[in-house]
Regions:
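Conserved ATP/PPi-binding loop(s) of AMP-dependent carboxylate-activating enzymes
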Residues: 509-513, 525-557, 595-601
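Conserved AMP-binding/adenylation subdomain of ANL enzymes
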Residues: 362-379, 387-427, 442
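AMP-binding/adenylate-forming catalytic core of the ANL superfamily
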Residues: 269, 429, 539, 544-545, ...
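Conserved AMP-binding/adenylate-forming core of the ANL superfamily
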Residues: 185-217, 222-232, 236, 253-258, ...
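AMP-binding/adenylate-forming catalytic domain of the ANL superfamily
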Residues: 298-299, 633-636, 659-684
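Conserved pre-ATP/AMP-binding loop-to-beta segment of ANL
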Residues: 183, 295-343, 349-350, 373-379
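Gly/Ser/Thr-rich phosphate-binding loop
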Residues: 298, 310-319, 426-431, 440-502, ...
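A cross-family acyltransferase "interaction/gating" segment
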Residues: 24-29, 54-57, 65-150
Length: 699
């Protein structure tokens, strides 16, 4: 009886009822202040979609906001979205979005009702709910998602731009997080370093003081250190000193390193005697390669710190307020200041200096945190080198969020990595497919070693079907593939671990604050859903420019739709749900007799042909690599490098000839090699592979 009276009262106030279905246009002008929307989906996607229609109205979300929105209250507030736990906290302004499970809180409210259903449950709600207005708008339907997708992404980028402007500098965020950690563990490494929050900050402050004296007149400082306690202390110390950090790739050629040093104008390089000794055993002579620079050793810095100075600093860290410590020890920096200069791998050409500003670094750390859902009790296995953008960002995700990181300097040391994860009970592992392949093949690494891992993310190179199958069969762990480039700081897309399905064969959905498009590589016209073309990207994590290379910067940037986009150089497509598939790099296509041939696809076809003959790469450790070289008659020819010891080139040629592989794809040359050239990051060194192939062809 009470509900009938309530409904009658509402009718008198509204004069009419509005009933819509998904086949009619919804007039969103009818959403007046005080309207209530009940939905069976109140995720961040739905809320942002609603905001594109209700741009001028405030949206309050009552409960059940999904986990992806946690920590983003400030971001949402900037664009007029907030969420509450109970109806009593609503100020009756704008529109209230209510999760279906909390409808009882609003059923007897005297506000205008609108029923907003996001799925097939509409009839159920229509029959049992006493609501005045009913709308069936199926946002989950593909056609509706496509319409909303672009506006949502535009809103997302705009929102994140505003969010970043409110953040403190990376050094201060990291510094404060370590202070908040207090006596809790934040970092360990395999050399025996164990640091809690107070010790980490103390070490960084003491090191920062000494480094400021040494590098007083320098803007860019080189770092040649492994993934270790010393490496991360040096990074924070230099951040506190407002220096741009250049993590040097000690696995690169001497020529590439000298180019990087000269381009960045580096005068001082921070390293350690223990690490130099290890590099010397591997044939890398630091003092020769870095002869043009002043080399500063961590051991010498440590020796200059007196015991009394250490105790005094430690007590200050424990006693003084964070705001005082920040003012005393951190040099002020702006979001537009340079944070890192990361040189590209040089896998295809001379290394480029990618300028990562504070805003780019922060954006990608928080974007990554949002999509991989890093938790406070997570511990990251830090195995990727700090000169690797992927390794650096993922490590900072942990350190910025209050988790801890366990470091091992050599990602190719399968047993060492396994021991690290087992000992520290790590929950997150980020590695390239090459490293995952090594762990799978190593018989001394077993399922129990990786038992504590809840999340495994791979990127930097394409994840092959073989590596995925082998790894998941051996360790019973799912791999989440992602995508990015150093120019994007670097994470741009990833298959979410929980909230969205892990769509095998794709690299997932774009990170929040970013947007992909597929364009024709020549005309630059946007291509429809599902059509392959050039991948371009814009977002808050996109670099502004290459160091001292305006020409190259202009080559990779394009003005489109009123924004600046980065041309990735990768061929791919986006499906109707927004998942990105990367086919290959455009540079990994050969032009044979006027036709474009994907070298990556050829490699997969060869693996398949060999498997049919009993040479299964899941069981036998070997690799194949297709390389295109110039040819006067055909434009380019394809040569196949392979490491299968038991097979002669003539035998492999016969297998390919009878395999059904199209003639256009069949290699001209077959070369058995000891190993495929690799970079320190685990990626294939295409530059060296091409050089090797040219030498073999000439021979």
């Amino acid at each position: 009886m009470r509900l009938k009276k309530l409904k009658s009262s509402i009718h008198k106030r509204l004069n009419q009822r509005y009933i819509y279905d998904c086949n009619k246009n919804i007039n969103f002008a009818n959403f007046k202040n005080g309207s209530i929307i009940v939905a069976n989906d109140t995720t961040i996607v739905t809320v942002l979609a609603l905001k594109t229609y209700l741009e001028d109205k405030y949206i309050t979300v009552l409960g059940a906001f999904d986990d992806r929105a946690k920590g983003l209250e400030k971001v949402m507030g900037r664009i007029g979205i907030k969420y509450i736990d109970h109806i009593s906290f609503w100020d009756h302004q704008g529109v209230l979005l209510v999760n279906k499970n909390l409808t009882s809180q609003v059923e007897q409210s005297e506000n205008r009702f609108i029923l907003f259903i996001c799925g097939p449950e509409m009839p159920y709600f229509s029959q049992r709910r006493n609501l005045d207005r009913q709308i069936y708008f199926d946002i989950a339907k593909l056609e509706n998602l496509r319409c909303l997708n672009e506006e949502m992404e535009n809103l997302s980028v705009k929102t994140w731009e505003g969010y970043l402007n409110e953040l403190k500098a990376p050094a201060e965020i990291w510094f404060r997080q370590m202070l908040n950690a207090k006596n809790n563990l934040v970092l360990t490494d395999t050399t025996g370093v164990v640091l809690d929050g107070y010790k980490f900050v103390t070490g960084a402050v003491l090191m920062s003081k000494k480094l400021q004296e040494i590098t007083q007149q320098e803007d860019n400082v080189g770092v040649c250190l492994p993934t270790s306690g010393g490496g991360y202390l040096a990074i924070l110390a230099l951040m506190m000193s407002a220096k741009a950090i250049v993590n040097l790739n000690y696995t690169a050629s001497e020529e590439a390193l000298r180019h990087s040093i000269n381009n960045a104008g580096i005068k001082t390089i921070i390293t350690s005697k223990a690490f130099v000794e290890k590099l010397t055993h591997k044939g890398f002579f630091v003092e020769e390669v870095f002869s043009m620079c002043k080399i500063v050793y961590l051991e010498d810095i440590r020796a200059k710190i007196t015991k009394s100075e250490g105790i005094k600093t430690f007590l200050e860290i424990k006693i003084l307020p964070a705001s005082w410590l920040v003012k005393k020890y951190l040099k002020p920096t702006k979001l537009d200041d340079v944070s890192f200069i990361i040189f590209s791998s040089g896998s295809e050409a001379v290394p480029k200096g990618i300028v990562i500003k504070n805003k780019n670094l922060l954006a990608n750390v928080y974007q990554s945190t949002n999509v991989i859902e890093c938790k406070e009790n997570d511990s990251v296995a830090g195995i990727l080198p700090i000169f690797h953008a992927f390794g650096l960002t993922i490590s900072l995700v942990s350190l910025f969020q209050g988790g801890y990181i366990a470091c091992h300097p050599d990602p190719t040391d399968a047993k060492g990595v396994a021991n690290l994860i087992r000992k520290n009970k790590n929950t997150v592992l980020c590695a390239t497919p090459t490293f995952l392949r090594i762990y799978t093949k190593n018989k001394s690494v077993n399922k129990e070693d990786f038992a504590t891992l809840r999340l495994i993310i791979t990127g930097a190179e394409k994840l092959s079907r073989e590596v995925r199958t082998m790894f998941e069969d051996k360790f019973d762990k799912v791999i989440n593939e992602g995508y990015g480039t150093t120019e994007l700081s670097p994470v741009a897309a990833v298959n979410r671990p929980t909230k969205s399905p892990n769509k095998i064969g794709t690299v997932g959905l774009t990170v929040p604050g970013g947007q992909f498009k597929i364009i024709h590589p020549e005309s630059h016209e946007e291509l429809p859903v599902g059509v392959e073309g050039m991948i371009i990207y814009r977002g808050v994590n996109k670099m502004d420019y290459y160091l001292n290379d305006l020409k190259k910067t202009n080559e990779v940037m394009i003005q489109k739709y009123g924004h600046t986009w980065y041309i990735t150089g990768d061929k791919g497509k986006i499906d109707g749900e927004g998942y990105l598939t990367v086919v290959d790099r455009y540079s990994r296509f050969a032009k044979v007799a006027g036709e474009m041939v994907s070298l990556g696809l050829l490699e997969q076809k060869v693996y398949d042909a060999l498997r049919e003959k009993g040479y299964d790469s899941n069981k036998i450790d070997f690799e194949v690599l297709a390389v295109a070289t110039s040819d006067t008659k055909r434009g380019e020819i394809i040569s196949l490098l392979y490491t299968l010891e038991v097979l002669e080139p003539s035998d492999l040629k016969e297998i390919v000839r009878h395999s059904g592989i199209e003639n256009l794809y069949k290699p001209t040359n077959y070369f058995k090699v000891i190993s495929i050239p690799k970079l320190g990051s685990g990626k294939t060194d295409f530059s060296k592979a091409k050089k090797l192939t040219n030498e073999l062809v000439k021979a």
